[in-house]
């Protein structure tokens, strides 16, 4: 299935040119950018997304405080074989700030609204960290639409260990500058290898992130933390029959391999795979082996 997306007059066309209605608007980015920014109305919010590549569609969901640019180092290879739909979650990136508290289920509703608007009925889902938790909710809400799940560096139930870390970040967001918060979180995301020999492309990505702005706002970040604190799907995912790859860095200290094993064990069609010599942000620290594993898995589970 190949899908072409356009952002013109609120119309989405498939490869045959069939006209499809979409709840779609086009805004603009920063003043120095002339590129159209497609946004989808999801309830009271507008949610930003980007598209890239050709092939079977894949929905990409990023983690806590992150936006679609966090996929930049794996995006080119993924886009060679798949049509990517990269979403900025509510309270992050170019999407709107939420008016109040919400759950990861609400964020899954946002993601499904994007796929509705671009006219894609069935797709793969790739989620990292909080995005992996949202991906679980997407599959639970729309099991017949999700062809496969790739869950990176994620978890199925927030335990006391992870809750303590998240609560500390919630407090730090109030007390520190966004840049200081990012520096404090970096050792949780990368291994010692990164600090010994930081890859130039990751440093460039970090510099670009600092220029764009690390956080949407402190309240926005805290609302996402609160949604993560309430996450618990381990008793729900056994209902899924979706082929699922739970991918984790072998040295991930934030969502360690024990989380991946527990989640994969709860998924009837789940398998766990470790990426060697990398940590939580495996898609940044070791993008090539991460991408290779994702693409091999997706190739085994086509939409048909």
Predicted regions and their residues:
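Acidic catalytic loop of the alpha/beta-hydrolase fold
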Residues: 251-255
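Catalytic active-site module of serine/aspartate enzymes centered on a nucleophile-bearing elbow/loop
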Residues: 270-304
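Conserved HGGG/HGGXW glycine-rich cap/lid loop of the alpha/beta-hydrolase fold
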Residues: 43-97
